[in-house]
A protein has these predicted regions:
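Start-of-repeat signature of ankyrin repeats
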Residues: 54, 87, 120, 153, ...
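Ankyrin-repeat-protein effector appendages
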Residues: 19-27, 142, 208, 225, ...
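Ankyrin repeat A-helix N-terminal signature
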Residues: 27-31, 60-66, 93-99, 126-132, ...
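Conserved ankyrin/ankyrin-like repeat signature
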Residues: 36, 68-69, 101-102, 134-135, ...
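N-terminal segments that cap or nucleate solenoid repeat domains
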Residues: 20-60
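Ankyrin repeat boundary/linker residues
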Residues: 51, 84, 117, 150, ...
Length: 505
C-alpha cells in the first residue's frame, strides 16, 4: 500500500515539475532568453504549453523575431499553427516583427500561409504593412491570396500603398493584386498612397495603369472626416500638404484646373494654408511632406497651367455668408486674410477686384464678411487689418454694395474688428454706409449689437467704435431694431409651426 502511495506521489511530483518547467519555458521565451529556452527544452518541458492567454513560447519567439529560438522550438515539435486566446498564430506575429527568415521558417514547418487574425487581417496584410519583402514573397510563394480582404474590405495592396512600401507594392501587383479594389469610402490603393504622401508608390501605381485624373466616388455616407466625391489624386495631395507629390501628379498629367469637387487646386490651397475654424481659432495646416512650401507650390501650379483668375461655376458653401459661385482663388485668400498668399497670387497675375456672382468683393471678404464665428475662424483682426489695407492700396472700391445689401463695413462688423472699422473710416468710407441696412434689415451697428445669425452677445468695443464714428458724422445711433430670433428660438418656433418673418433669419 505504501509503495502505491509513494508511486502516486512520485507521479504527482513529476507532473508538477513538468508543469513548472513548461511555465518556465514560456516565461523564458517572453524574456527573450534563448539559452534558458534551450535548457527548458532539454529538460523535457512541454514546448506547446501556453500561459493563461493561450500564448506559447513560439508565439513569443515570433513576436520577438528571434529566429534561433523559434528554430529550436520548431525542431522540438512546437505547433506552428497554435492560436492564442485572440486567435493569433505565430506566423502573424512573425510578420508583425518584420522577420522574413522567421516567416520562411514557419511556412516550411507547416504554418498556414492564409492564417488570419480576428477581423480578417491575414498574415500577408500584416507583412505588407510592415514592409518586409522577403516575408511577402514567401507568403505568396506558399499560396497566400493577394486579394484577401479584412472586415473593412481593405487589402494587402492598400496597406502596402498607405505605408509607402514600394517593393512590396510591386510584388503584390506582380502576384495579381487587384488594382481596382475600392472601399465604400471611394479609396483605392492610389488614393491611400496619395493621402499619406507616398510619391514613389503613387508613381508605381500610375505606371501600373491608374488614371492620374480619376475621381474618387463614395458609395456610402462617411462617419468621419472624409474626402469629397469627385476628388482627384491632385486635390487629395494638396489637402494633405504633399506639395512635391502634387507636382509629380501634375507632371504625370493631372488637370491643374480640376473643379469636380466644386473647387480648383488653387482654391483648395487657401483653406489648406489656413484651415477652417475650430473651438480654439484656426487649426494648424497639415504637416505634409517634402521641402516645397505652399507658396512655392502655388507658383509651380500656375506655371503648369492653373488659371489664377478661375471663377467657380458652383460649389458648396465654405462660409454661409459668401456665395462661392464666381469666386476666385484671390477672393478665397482674402476671406482667410492670408496676405502672403494674396501677394503671391497678385505677383502671378490675380485680379484683386473680381467679385463673386453676388458682387461680394475681396475687400468685403478681407474685412470680415462671411464670418460666422468671430475669434474661431482663420484670420485674426491684425491679419484682417493688413489684408484690408492691402486691398485699399490696390484701389478696391470701399463703397461697393453687393446684391445682399452688404458693404465692407458690414464685413468688419461681422468679424468684430474695431481696428478695421477705424481703418475704413480713415480711408474715406461713406458715412451713409454706416447706417446702410442689408437685406435682413441689419446695419453694421445692429450686427455689432447681436442682430445676426445664431445667438450672439453684443460686441461692446465694436459698438463703441461705430457709435463714436457715427456721432462724429452726425448720424443717429438710435432707431428701431429688427426683431431678432436666435437659433434655439427659431427651432422652437419651427416645432410649433410658427411662420418666421424672413427678415429675422
Amino acid at each position: 500500500m505504501r509503495w502505491r502511495e509513494f508511486g502516486a506521489l512520485a507521479a504527482l511530483l513529476a507532473l508538477a515539475a513538468t508543469a513548472a518547467t513548461s511555465a518556465d519555458l514560456v516565461g523564458a521565451a517572453e524574456a527573450g532568453d534563448s539559452a534558458a529556452v534551450r535548457a527548458q527544452i532539454d529538460s523535457g518541458a512541454n514546448v506547446n504549453a501556453a500561459d493563461s492567454g493561450g500564448t506559447t513560447a513560439l508565439h513569443w519567439a515570433a513576436h520577438l523575431g528571434d529566429v534561433s529560438m523559434a528554430e529550436a522550438l520548431v525542431t522540438a515539435g512546437a505547433d506552428v499553427n497554435a492560436r492564442n486566446a485572440y486567435g493569433v498564430r505565430p506566423i502573424s506575429l512573425a510578420c508583425s516583427s518584420g522577420s522574413g527568415k522567421l516567416v520562411k521558417l514557419l511556412l516550411e514547418a507547416g504554418a498556414e500561409a492564409e492564417a488570419s487574425r480576428s477581423g480578417g487581417e491575414t498574415a500577408l496584410m500584416t507583412a505588407a504593412r510592415t514592409g518586409n519583402l522577403e516575408a511577402v514573397e514567401a507568403l505568396l510563394a506558399h499560396g497566400a491570396d493577394p486579394n484577401a480582404s479584412e472586415r473593412n474590405a481593405q487589402t494587402a495592396l492598400m496597406w502596402a500603398s498607405a505605408e509607402g512600401h514600394e517593393p512590396v507594392v510591386k510584388a503584390l501587383i506582380a502576384a495579381g493584386a487587384d488594382l481596382r479594389a475600392t472601399l465604400d469610402s471611394g479609396f483605392n490603393p492610389l488614393f491611400f498612397a496619395v493621402r499619406e504622401g507616398r510619391a514613389d508608390v503613387a508613381r508605381t501605381l500610375l505606371a501600373a495603369g491608374y488614371d492620374v485624373n480619376e475621381a474618387l466616388q463614395r458609395r456610402t455616407r462617411p462617419q468621419y472626416q472624409h474626402a469629397d466625391s469627385g476628388m482627384s489624386p491632385l486635390i487629395l495631395a494638396i489637402e494633405n500638404g504633399h506639395y512635391e507629390l502634387a507636382v509629380a501628379l501634375l507632371e504625370a498629367g493631372a488637370d491643374p484646373n480640376d473643379e469636380r469637387t466644386g473647387y480648383t487646386p488653387l482654391h483648395t490651397i487657401t483653406w489648406v494654408r489656413k484651415p477652417k475654424n475650430s473651438d480654439y481659432g484656426s487649426d494648424p495646416a497639415p504637416e505634409g511632406s517634402g521641402n516645397l512650401s505652399s507658396l512655392q507650390f502655388v507658383q509651380t501650379l500656375v506655371a503648369m497651367g492653373a488659371d489664377v483668375n478661375r471663377r467657380l461655376a458652383n460649389g458648396h458653401s465654405i462660409a454661409p455668408k459668401i456665395n462661392v459661385q464666381g469666386a476666385t482663388p484671390f477672393l478665397f485668400a482674402a476671406d482667410k486674410a492670408d496676405v502672403p498668399l494674396m501677394k503671391t497670387l497678385l505677383d502671378l497675375g490675380a485680379d484683386p477686384l473680381l467679385p463673386n456672382v453676388e458682387g461680394t468683393t475681396p475687400l468685403m471678404a478681407a474685412a470680415g464678411l462671411g464670418t460666422t464665428a468671430p475669434l474661431e475662424e482663420a484670420g485674426t483682426e491684425q491679419e484682417a487689418y493688413q489684408a484690408t489695407k492691402l486691398l485699399l492700396s490696390l484701389g478696391a472700391d470701399i463703397h461697393a454694395v453687393d446684391s445682399n445689401g452688404e458693404t465692407v463695413m458690414h464685413g468688419a462688423a461681422y468679424g468684430s474688428f474695431p481696428t478695421v472699422i477705424q481703418l475704413l473710416a480713415e480711408s474715406g468710407a461713406d458715412p451713409e454706409l454706416w447706417k446702410q441696412p442689408n437685406k435682413h434689415g441689419w446695419t453694421p451697428l445692429f450686427i455689432a449689437e447681436g442682430y445676426r445669425p445664431g445667438n450672439f452677445k453684443p460686441a461692446p468695443l465694436v459698438i463703441a467704435t461705430l457709435e463714436q464714428l457715427m456721432v462724429a458724422e452726425g448720424i443717429s445711433t438710435e432707431g428701431p431694431r429688427p426683431r431678432h430670433i436666435g437659433t434655439y428660438e427659431k427651432a422652437r418656433l419651427a416645432r410649433q409651426q410658427v411662420r418666421i418673418d424672413p427678415r429675422t433669419r
